[in-house]
């Protein structure tokens, strides 16, 4: 499924899409954290589906299908652990930490990629949670990547409301999607085609696939708005003196 991007959005459309995107990314971040009983109840009573469907429909013009959740919280948690933490024989389907996927490292050491992601976070005033706040964030966990996309969507909406140029935050969203979010979602969606035992909740399987499709369409939408993504190497080759200190995000 693809977002509707055939015509440039009006002011009101752009604001509505930014707010719907914020909701969708934030709901994704919630879903990919370790399951808690409140999330299971939201799956059972339909409130999680209702929230995703509202955002998804606003972005794509299509309803979001509802999957049947596990009846017991223990089954939801067991499926998540088997898929993403340690499955049968200690083998999970896929880690939710980007730094544990060689395909995403592209020959770089994990600390370097962590530093790159933290540069995004710091630029927009975010910091890592610490143990005295109840949890410790892993900056390369899929939930953190999706939460950051929600923050960028929120900032885009704020810029539109305030009459400011949303271009800088849109360029940041484009760069973050291309470099981190889309490849991570693509990898996990591909891996989840294989069954796990116990099975992963069908809502999470669908959400992974559909978030990847939305990430793809969002990259195309942003490219039309602020230009296509260019790697640091490409910028350096074309303008070596300026690229080293260029701030694309305002």
Curated annotation (Swiss-Prot):
Question: Where is this protein localized, as stated in its record?
Answer: Cytoplasm
Species lineage: Bacteria, Pseudomonadati, Pseudomonadota, Alphaproteobacteria, Rhodobacterales
> What's a GO cellular component annotated to this UniProt protein?
cytoplasm
- Its source organism is Rhodovulum sulfidophilum
Protein name, entry field:
Dimethyl sulfide dehydrogenase assembly chaperone protein
Where primarily located? Answer: cytoplasm
Provide the alphabetized UniProt keywords. Answer: Chaperone, Cytoplasm
According to its UniProt entry, the function of this protein is described as: May function as a system-specific chaperone protein essential for the assembly of an active dimethyl sulfide dehydrogenase DdhABC.
By its UniProt entry, which Pfam families does this protein fall under? Nitrate_red_del
Q: Where is this region: Disordered?
A: 231-250
Gene name in the database record: ddhD
Record-stated family = Belongs to the type II DMSO reductase enzyme chaperone family.
